[in-house]
Structures are given as structure tokens and as C-alpha cells.
Amino acid sequence: MDKFQRDGKEYTSRQRRFLYPFLFKEDLYAIAIDHYFNRSSSFEPMENSSSNDRFSFLTVKRSISRMRQQNGSIVPFVNCNQKKLVGYNRSFYSELVLGGLTAVPEVPFSIRSKHSLEGMNEWTSFRSINSIFPLMEDKIPHSNFILDIRIPHLTHPEILVRTFRRWIQDAPFLHSLRFVLHEHRNLIISSNLDQLILIASKENTRLSLFLWNSYAYECESLLVPLWKRFSHSRSLPYESFVERTPFCRKIEHIIIFSHKYLKKSLWFLKDPSIHYVKYRERSIIALRGTYLLVKKWRYHLTNFWQCHFHLWLQPYRIYIDELSNNCFSFLGYLLSVKMNTSVVRIKMLDDSFITDLITKEFDPIAPTTLLIGSLAKEKFCDISGHPISRLAWTGLTDDDILDRFDRIWRNIFHYYSGSSKKDGLYRMKYILRLPCAKTLACKHKSAIRVVRERFGSELFTKSFPKERESIFLSFSKTRSQRERIWHSDIIQRNPLVNSWWKKHNFQIEPLFDR
């Protein structure tokens, strides 16, 4: 793969990103075959020992050539030689070609994205989910509104082709990609839609993920330069308004921003407090200003994406939340900004007086009620939080039962260790402790009291290791009880978070601001 990437870098720089010949490189499909057999567990038509011997690279070449000579046929492998498909179904060669169409543009896309981010400290990408929260902890308290954006998954195939045309000048490759996007609806296109393509499909194929990431990157690529130019723009000169002092003081904080993709100049208040974070299809833009200003930002962002990227993002998909009054959900947390009031005595030379000092604090909270609902859905408790035994696990050994409950609690506590309130987490621990004891009691046909006497301190103590407990206790002694610990080794959402997030995120969206 490294050799393929080196060849891709040299070829792209010399031939101006002509990628179609790479589809006929045999090394590419050797990688695709390894990926196919490592991923697929249901491939049974032939023995693994002879699988690589029966692969025909000539069939792949003919399939790619026929893709550009189709007459409306959905499957481009119908006319292939049936003898060369012995031991393989047509979906195997179809997946190989799709893998090639995915792997080839990944190389110039990675080079292009890396080159565009050089010297731009405002735009950083992290693997850890929790790396987002320290940024929000520092920046969001200085903002008073957020734009909660839900990026749609559906778009037209031609929009994706036009997106790739901005950085790929290879017409044959684009024709092949267009054919795949229009015809392979069973892999990356929703079955109940005729014209729209589902970018992030349920199968999460490599091609659908690449299409989603590249399209989202294109939509975000101009945000940082736009905001950077906006925040560093000079104020409007006001020498001609010398006699109108009040108007001068107001207009010096106004800038006029024009862009080559916009037909009109945009007037905004000059305020550099704009922060942007994204995880998958959720994007958060934190702003400081009035409600009218935030509505203007939503209007102009919607028009900008529609005119330039054909991203039909309806205004009701961009929620406006006021941080001082509302909380919003992001990555399984309920986030808000809390106002803290402290009494301060100010001493002057001749007198002293008492005043109130108001500070803003970022307040992430674990949604205990929603997590209990997820546990109820997984049959660990009922909807009110009363524990239920897991009868399906009674056939396992005692260590396996303990390890499974330990793993569930460890993941919950590890993920929500940054919560400002730990009471809900210990309630979750109590809910999981009783199902563990009840499951062991059902297995041994005894009472819960007997199980506790038998296992003693080993029951449900593996989930809170001594080293982690000592770290947490030492941190609590030296710091405030509301200080948070963000673990940088978390790279995906908690499974319980995914269950309630899907229900919360894909409900019917309101037509008005929250």
C-alpha cells in the first residue's frame, strides 16, 4: 500500500491527477482481495487455500472497460465470461471494482487535504472524541449562541461528481464514478429513492464513507478561510462621517465581506468569537452576538452552501440555541453554560464594598435518564430503573458474567468521566450491580444474599480498578469536586449513547427554533 501511495503521489503530480490508469494496476486489487477475505465471513463457494489462484485480473479489466460501454444495464458484470466466475459470485468482482474506485482517489484526496491544512492552525483534526470537549470548555463560555447543524445524508449523484471535478481532471475516471453512483443502488443508494444517493449507508461501505468524508470536507473547506478573512478584515473607514460621531463609533465595528462565490457583499458585525467543531453529521458553531445576528449567520451559511456546493440545507436543520437558557446534546452529553455568582469584597483606599462576580462555566452532564432508557432497551432494567436479571447469560461461566458487567460499567464511567455531576454515574453502577448479582443467583439457583456472601468483594469490583480509583481520589483531593477528567483514548461513542442518540436524532425535526 505504501508503494501504491508513493506511485500515486508521483503520478498525480506529473500527470495532473489522471487517475483512470490506476484502475488497471494489479497491486491495487491484491490489496482489495485481502481486505475482502479479511472482512467477509460468509464467502463459502471455494476453499481459502485456492482463492487467490482462481482470481482473474483480466476479468476485472474487462469489467472496468464495460462500465463505460453500458446500455442501461444495472450490473456491469452480466456479460463476463461465466467460466472465469467459477468459485466467485458477481458481487465479488463488483466489490473489487468498487474498492478500486475508492482506493484510487483516496491518495490524491489525502495529499490535497494535508496540503490545504498546512500553516492553518485554526483547523485541527483529532482521533479522540474527548479532545473536542477541552476546546468547548475554553471557548463556549465566551459565546452566547450556538448553531446546531445536522448535515443531510442524501444528495444527488451528479452533485458528488461535480465535487470531484474540482480536484480531479480525469474524465474517464469521473465517468466510471458516475456510472457507479447512478447504477449501484444496492450498495450505496437508498432502495426507496429514485434520484437521491444515500452517502452514509447502513452498510457503511468504504465507498460510502469516502463519499461522505470528501463531500463534508468540501463543504467545510471554505469555512476557515472565510472566517479567517472575516476576523482579520479591516474596519470600514469613517473619515467621511466626521460630523456624525455616534454613527462613527458604531460603523467602525462593521465590516463588508465579499467573496467570489457570492453575488452580493455581506455586512456583519466584526467579532472574532466564532468556533466550529464537527463529529460525523453533527456540526456546532459557537457565536457571540445578538439573536438577529445569529439568524443572519444561519441565513448566509445556508445560501452559501446551496449556491456553491448544492447542499440543500433547510433552515430548520440548523437549530439556534441560546446557551444561557437551553442545553444541547452532543456526543452523548447534555452541554450548557452555567452562571456562577460569587460574593467579592473590593477594598479601596478609603472604603470597601461588596459586589457580585458572575462567571460562566462549561457544564457537561451525563444524561442519566436517557442512559437508563438505553439499559432498559438492552434488558438490564425496566423503564423505571429497577434491575432485571440477564437470563440469557446464565449459561456462561461466573468469570464471563462478571467480566461482561465490568466491561459495561467501565465503558460508561470512562466515557462520562468528564461529567460535572457524578451522582448519575454511581446510580448507573448500582443499577448494573443488582442485575449482575441476580444473574449469578439465577444461575446457581440461590438468593442474592448467598451470591454476595460467596463472591464477597470480588462481585462487581473489577470495573473500578484500584489504580483508576486512586487516580480519581487523588485528583478529587487536590482539585475541586467539579473538575473534569477527559480521557484521550476514546475514539468512538459509547454503545449506549448510540442507541438513545439514534432515537433522539432521527425523530421528526421541529420547524421552529428551540
From Swiss-Prot:
Name the record gives this protein: Maturase K
One family name in Pfam for this protein: MatK_N
Primary localization class, coarse: plastid
Cellular localisation: Plastid, Chloroplast
CC terms in the record's Gene Ontology section: chloroplast
Organism: Zamia integrifolia (Coontie)
Signal peptide: none
Keywords: Chloroplast, mRNA processing, Plastid, RNA-binding, tRNA processing
Its biological purpose: Usually encoded in the trnK tRNA gene intron. Probably assists in splicing its own and other chloroplast group II introns.
The family this protein is said to belong to: Belongs to the intron maturase 2 family. MatK subfamily.
